[in-house]
Amino acid sequence: MYNILQLSDIHYGADYDGKFDTADQWDAVVRSAQKTLPTGYDAIVITGDIVDDDPNVSDDVKRERYEKVFTDALDLRKNEKSPLLVTPGNHDNRAILTEVADKVLPCLQWGLKQTDGFKDVGGQCLFATVGSKTLVILDSGTVDPYKGITKLAAHVLENKWNKEDTLLFTHKPFQNSRLYHRFMKDNLLPAEVGDLIAPYTFEYFCGHFHHLATVNATTINSRLNGVDVNMHVCPGIQCQIDPYSKDCVAIPIPGYQVITFEESSNSAVYVHPVILDDYVVKDKT
């Protein structure tokens, strides 16, 4: 059995006027993830919004925050060969994130190699093989705000990897003008999810919403008519947001999820969300 740890929407160090203690929440998640699987994870994927690019915070402090998150995450791996893959979110400083990752994660391949078909794709792609699965991580530069994934990235995904064994990760979910709704507070149409995802993968993972959700979709319009796909939205570490409340109420309870599968090709993928319901906001007085 292989175990992948997905961490998302950490916003490390930001307190949003005292509403959150994101450093303490991160520490709580690290402890929980260690307890959940003491032997460590075969891979770790951090899907964005790691450190806020706050203009009131110095770049040196941002570097320290990224380094803290990356070094803590490295300690959650099964061994030193287990990959740690990260992608920027909309709140990250891409340059500082990349600088620190190059320092702390020397084995992490940034940039797109022409031999992998990613020349001029407009963003970055990271990938790693874990058992029978290929983990593909696309940053926001490869996702068009209205049309989903860019044509070139789509071409590579369709031709490079067997989609039955591809686990695709992004920060923001695939979106178009009808599909994407902030914090999922409006109807998310499963058929549209399926039509966007099915050409590339049957198991898709994202963050951004700070809201645990799984969308099971059957395609109706794509050439893969009748194919079942799943979109898994990871709980946020900073908070969970109730998309159905009047003002999208944010609850300072951290969460994450563990993805498991067997060695064999085409093996089923299982997602185990963890919400720290017993988390108590740290008293700062």
What are the residue ranges of the model-derived segments?
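Extended active-site neighborhood of metal-dependent phosphoesterases/phosphodiesterases
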Residues: 59-155, 192, 200, 220-235, ...
